[in-house]
Design a protein with these regions (language model features):
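Ubiquitin-like/PB1-type beta-grasp interaction modules and other compact soluble beta-rich domains
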Residues: 1-79
Length: 81
């Protein structure tokens, strides 16, 4: 599956996206654990629950079961005026 990063998350990962094997993770929660291992700086943002996850362009809950063809996007909080 493809994981896409946006805004300052790209600065943490130093890339726009990753390709992750579907055998693990199987849910968004498991994906977060996997990403924490790859990018330890993300952990504090996951703990603060400030990042939003979209699967195939729809926001989802953390217990959603993922499929190999899914595209996951991770968004930081949005502000504006």
């Amino acid at each position: 599956m493809r994981i896409r990063y946006f805004a300052w998350i790209k600065d943490i990962t130093n890339k726009d996206d990753d390709i992750i094997d579907i055998n693990h993770p199987k849910t968004i929660e498991e994906l977060k654990q996997n990403l924490e291992n790859l990018y330890p700086e993300l952990k504090k943002h996951f703990l603060q629950d400030v990042l939003r996850f979209a699967v195939n362009q729809e926001y989802v809950s953390e217990n959603l079961k993922l499929k190999p063809i899914d595209e996951i996007a991770i968004f930081p909080p949005v502000s504006g005026g």
